[in-house]
Regions:
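Extracellular loop-to-transmembrane helix junctions
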Residues: 53-73, 127-157, 166, 511-519
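Membrane-interface "cap" regions at the ends of multi-pass membrane proteins
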Residues: 64-121, 327
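Helix-loop-helix module between adjacent transmembrane segments
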Residues: 64-65, 69, 111, 145-161, ...
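Loop-to-transmembrane helix boundary motifs in multi-pass membrane proteins
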Residues: 175-179, 186, 216, 334-343, ...
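Hydrophobic alpha-helical segments and their helix-loop junctions in multi-pass secondary transporters
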Residues: 193-217, 225-227, 246-284, 469-479, ...
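Extracellular/periplasmic helix-exit of transmembrane alpha-helices
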Residues: 258-280, 334-376
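Membrane-helix boundary/coupling elements in multi-pass transport proteins
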Residues: 119-125, 161, 188-201, 300-322, ...
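Helix-loop-helix connectors at the membrane interface of multi-pass transporters/channels
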Residues: 162-176, 199-215, 315-340, 373-376, ...
Length: 541
């Protein structure tokens, strides 16, 4: 078994190397610019097969993401060793409210919609302002960072009665980390829930003629019901419907890009634009219009879709609904890879439609939101009706994340005060003040607060991966699978902390030296802590 796991691991590395080599040798070739129906640039090809480098890269990226699940995902599964004989929290602690066995497909959809939000769309579109290097980060980060983070954090929660992230961090990083993470996670989750109500409301208002405040109240009303009712009552029934909008959005954009090189062979009624997919393949230069440093800012901008600490706050929700431990990889790892594919498609779509990061930067400059760029892409490629369907998908993603966030916040508060949540009155005791705070916060200006959302997100991911490293070290298993991405993300958040003008404002070089030294110290401390923990940490449920 160990030999097969090792071979699968090196096979995954080989795939990554091939992917990197093809990216390096792909030549940069651009076509002439035409005006799309909305006046945005669309790149014409001299013929249907005149330049297939970008098209091949696009297909290859999606295939590598899928292959990463079936190869590296199996390696992670062998490292963790799921046990079919162990009872899961849903079976051992069933209460009909939060601990409920649900079909795997339904749990997968809820997990996907809970973690996705606007990150794999807005974050991916804004991330490609740094150039095609963003596509490399999505693929490599999703497989070797995001899937590791989501699978292990979800499975550790599963082994500990569906514990929330603060309890997991406290168990492996210490009691101080537990209390700090409780405060951070609760505040962080409330902010995410509020923004994922205000954001969709701002999109829906001009589409319907209703005011933004009216939509905020409607969305909060749905959030409240989804937070207090049994998980299968609303989320278990509504999410399959939400997933239809998500599928239409992804399949629509993906279909246009796959058929674009063959547009002249397509029926007229399909309205497939003739364009060059990914005309700009300059992977190794920072292209950001404002000259923001690619490292670390790009790795903070693209969080969801690559690796995101926010996911670890959501996984315990579904860890309480799995029937067997074998369902962990398709639910936690599979949802992460699916989100990575969504992010990759939207990042590639933005580069294809606008042609260059500079053109995309002009379209999103002067306060123009990425939602405008997304609407232009969808309307140009899919027409007015298709644009509406895509924008509905864009609205559904944050709403389906916001309800899960606030439900998890209720559970985290319940864990803090040891409040049993079987009775409705106990749930209302937490939910009413929680939503009162959320409504009060919804009127605040997020222009400054949201700048640090991505940084806090990656800080949470780094802490989670260090906790996973300690867990694996305590079991004498391959802790490097988590320690390496933990070290990288720690370097990202520390470099941003030291070098960002909004934070410490040190010189880039001095910040990098300090960050590397601190990461080395953190890594040594975590590995020593892991070797000192006893192995018998997982009670039979």
């Amino acid at each position: 078994m160990h030999k097969n796991g090792t071979s699968d691991f090196f096979f995954g590395l080989a795939i990554r190397s091939v992917f990197f080599s093809l990216s390096l040798t792909a030549c940069q070739k651009r076509g002439e610019q035409l005006s799309s129906p909305n006046g945005q640039p669309v790149h014409e090809m001299a013929g249907p097969f005149s330049n297939m480098n970008g098209y091949c890269y696009f297909i290859l990226g999606i295939l590598i993401l899928a292959a990463g699940y079936f190869t590296y995902g199996r390696v992670l599964e062998k490292i963790f060793r799921p046990d079919a004989s162990r009872q899961t929290p849903a079976v051992a602690c069933t209460d009909g409210v939060d601990y409920v066995v649900m079909p795997r497909w339904r749990v997968f959809l809820i997990q996907l919609l809970n973690i996705a939000g606007l990150g794999p769309i807005f974050g991916a579109v804004m991330g490609v302002l740094y150039g095609p290097a963003a596509l490399l980060w999505i693929v490599i980060g999703c497989i070797f960072g995001g899937m590791v983070h989501d699978y292990f954090s979800g499975m550790i929660s599963l082994r500990h009665k569906g514990e929330n992230l603060p309890e997991i961090l406290g168990r492996y990083l210490g009691s101080q980390a537990q209390w700090i993470s409780r405060a951070v996670c609760i505040v962080f989750s409330v902010l995410v829930g509020v923004v994922f109500a205000v954001g969709p409301a701002a999109i829906l208002a001009p589409m319907t003629g209703w005011s933004v405040s009216a939509w905020v109240w409607i969305i909060f009303g749905y959030y409240f019901l989804a937070t207090i009712l049994p998980i299968q009552a609303i989320m278990g029934k509504v999410y399959p419907l939400f997933s239809v909008a998500l599928i239409i959005m992804v399949v629509g954009i993906l279909g246009v890009m796959l058929l674009a090189p063959f547009a002249e062979f397509m029926p007229y009624w399909m309205h497939i634009p003739s364009m060059e997919v990914l005309p700009d393949l300059d992977f190794f230069h920072n292209r950001h219009p404002a000259d923001f440093p690619l490292f670390p800012v790009m790795f903070i901008t693209i969080a969801c879709g690559a690796v995101s600490g926010f996911h670890a706050t959501q996984s315990p929700l579904m860890a309480r609904c799995l029937k067997t431990e074998q369902e962990g990889l398709p639910v936690f790892g599979g949802a992460m890879i699916t989100e990575g594919i969504i992010a990759f498609i939207w990042a590639a779509a933005a580069l294809t439609f606008y042609g260059t990061p500079e053109a995309l930067g002009a379209a999103t400059a002067n306060g123009k939101a990425p939602a405008l760029a997304i609407q232009m892409i969808s309307e140009s490629w899919m027409g007015h009706v298709g644009s509406i369907l895509v924008m509905v998908g864009v609205v559904i993603l944050p709403i389906s994340t916001g309800d899960g966030v606030l439900r998890v916040t209720r559970l985290m508060i319940a864990d803090c005060f040891k409040l049993n949540q079987e009775q409705l009155s106990r749930r209302l005791m937490i939910a009413i003040p929680l939503f009162a705070a959320a409504i009060a916060v919804s009127s605040m200006d997020y222009a400054i607060i949201w700048q640090y959302f991505g940084w806090a997100n990656q800080l949470l991911a780094a802490a989670t991966l260090w906790a996973v490293s300690i867990y694996l070290r305590s079991k004498n298993r391959c802790c490097w699978t988590a320690a390496v991405p933990a070290a990288f993300l720690s370097l990202v958040v520390l470099q941003y902390l030291f070098s960002s003008p909004e934070m410490c404002g040190f010189s880039y070089e001095a910040s990098l030296v300090c960050s590397v030294l601190l990461v080395a110290v953190i890594g040594v401390l975590c590995l020593f802590r892991g070797s000192g923990l006893e192995k018998a940490e997982e009670p039979n449920l």
